[in-house]
UniProtKB/Swiss-Prot annotation:
Enzyme class name: isomerase
Name recorded for this polypeptide: 1-(5-phosphoribosyl)-5-[(5-phosphoribosylamino)methylideneamino] imidazole-4-carboxamide isomerase
HAMAP family, per database record: HisA (MF_01014)
Source lineage: Bacteria, Pseudomonadati, Pseudomonadota, Gammaproteobacteria, Oceanospirillales
Compartments (UniProt record): Cytoplasm
Family annotation (NCBIfam families): 1-(5-phosphoribosyl)-5-[(5-phosphoribosylamino)methylideneamino]imidazole-4-carboxamide isomerase, PRK13585.1
Source species: Chromohalobacter salexigens (strain ATCC BAA-138 / DSM 3043 / CIP 106854 / NCIMB 13768 / 1H11)
GO cellular component, one term: cytoplasm
């Protein structure tokens, strides 16, 4: 299981939002490449980037910062979400060196688009499902649909989607712990590896996810906890590696 630092980009700065509210953000730095370097130096093996402006505007806004990070670390898997709604955007990011693109709102509104992109860019497409009380939210979390996250995940399992990034938006940025039950249920029933997001607060949350990792938990994205020093990326990754070694022995 991977511990994946999040770098959320708003107006070219590194920020964290509370529950997806653009008017409730904390700024942690104004140099995205330097922030990426910080997490790489702690041993991060993948980075999760989010173009927050892009998520709300429906098109890339912070692509320059994303590209700069990808070019600075060409061997590091990088996933980007926010404003990815066209094949042209996906192609541009992949050509810039990004490893995975996360389709969120567009996946909910136009599921056929996901299958088309998986065929065109095999192995590079992740679907981001943001949910409140099990129901999928779209448009930068501004709208909550009547679709259940588990049901939607099942649709994408046959399309060739690489994995699901699952965010419990009631907990994201609130330091309230991961929704373990919902994450494990999605992994078991959705048929795809799941990257947990939202609510990772301390090492105990990583330990709790490790308990259900066999259900298909690929990793855990963490933001505010690592920025505020409540979770050490290196320590958390060592714990994951040790657990894996124990299971293999």
């Amino acid at each position: 299981m991977l511990v994946i630092p999040a770098i959320d980009l708003k107006d070219g700065q590194c920020v964290r939002l509370k529950q997806g509210r653009m008017d409730d953000s904390t700024t942690y730095g104004d140099d995205p490449v330097a922030m990426a370097a910080r997490w790489v130096e702690t041993g991060a093996r993948r980075l999760h980037l989010v173009d927050l402006n892009g998520a709300f505007e429906g098109k890339p806004v912070n692509a320059e910062a994303v590209t700069a990070i990808a070019r600075a670390y060409p061997d590091l898997p990088i996933q980007i979400g926010g404003g990815i709604r066209t094949a042209e955007t996906i192609e541009a990011y992949l050509e810039a060196g990004v490893s995975y693109v996360i389709i969120g709102t567009q996946a909910v509104k136009e599921p056929a688009f996901v299958g088309e992109m998986c065929r065109r860019f095999p192995g590079h497409v992740i679907v981001g499902l943001d949910a409140r009380d099990g129901y999928v939210a779209t448009d930068g979390w501004a709208e909550v649909s009547t679709l259940k996250a588990v049901d939607l995940a099942k649709r994408f399992a046959d399309d060739g989607v690489s994995s699901i990034v699952y965010t419990d938006i009631a907990r994201d940025g609130m330091m309230q712990g991961v929704n373990i039950a919902a994450t494990a249920e999605l992994a078991r029933e959705g048929g795809l590896p799941v990257i947990a997001s939202g609510g990772v607060t301390h090492l105990g949350d990583i330990e709790a996810l490790l308990e259900v990792a066999d259900a298909g938990i690929l990793g855990a994205i963490t933001g505010r906890a690592i920025y505020e020093g409540k979770l050490d990326v290196a320590e958390a990754q060592r714990l994951c590696d040790a657990q894996l070694a124990t299971r293999r022995s």
